[in-house]
Amino acid sequence: LFLTMGACNNTPKAPILLEAEKTIEKQPDSALNYLGRVNSDLQDALQAQEYYLRALEIGEDSKNYTLLIKIYNNLGTLYAYQDINDMALPMYKKVLSYLELEPDSVKTAFTLRNIARIYSLIQKSDSSIIYYKRAISYSAIKNKASILIDLGNLYLSLKDYKKAYQCIEKAEPLINNEKTLYPIYLSKGELYIATNQLDSAKFYLNHCVKSSNIHTRAGSLYHLAQIAQKEKNINDLIKYSNLYEQTRDSIVNSSHFENI
């Protein structure tokens, strides 16, 4: 769900940082938030956090709700990327409180989804389901599918296969291109494995292998290897296990490179 962020405090400051620092005197809270975003993009989590917290010190008492929403959301995302969920959750809830003062249905939907994801990660499934359902109620049609898939996957992990199927089926008609169908196919594959419909599972998982998203490909290969093991198909088990290991190594190497 979330990527791990590494710090690179020894990296020389980029020109964009030096330029942004010059604007701090004019609009300190806005400039500091911007510097936080830049450092976050540069994988320097500690420096990003420092800028965001400085921005809050200056802007907390203002009525610039738009900026406060951005800062708290950025902090929540920063903590979530580092799997510091106990700190991410209150940040996202602060976003929600400011969205009550400055309503925005799109931002509200995504914030509710982020809170639902955190609750799912900390094993509070009932709270997660409540927030996913609230997110769906606020969401525009074009964004509803991804939230339905998240909720379907949660039900799948809880072995509530009927509700998982309902969510996934509701999501599919909302997607109009094959590229974004792959996450649904992956969820369907997992669901059909869980309900022992292996031919149907293979049908959808073989589609996922064509995905350009390396994580989706890895997931499909892992589950195809699972099916081969269930069917005692040694050739396919070796084939998909090897492909999965290669794909997983690529993910690990890519993550390691990003964190240097």
Residue ranges of predicted features:
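C-terminal motif of bacterial Sec signal peptides marking the signal peptidase cleavage site
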Residues: 5-7
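Amphipathic alpha-helical segments of tetratricopeptide repeats
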Residues: 54-58, 63, 94-103, 133-137, ...
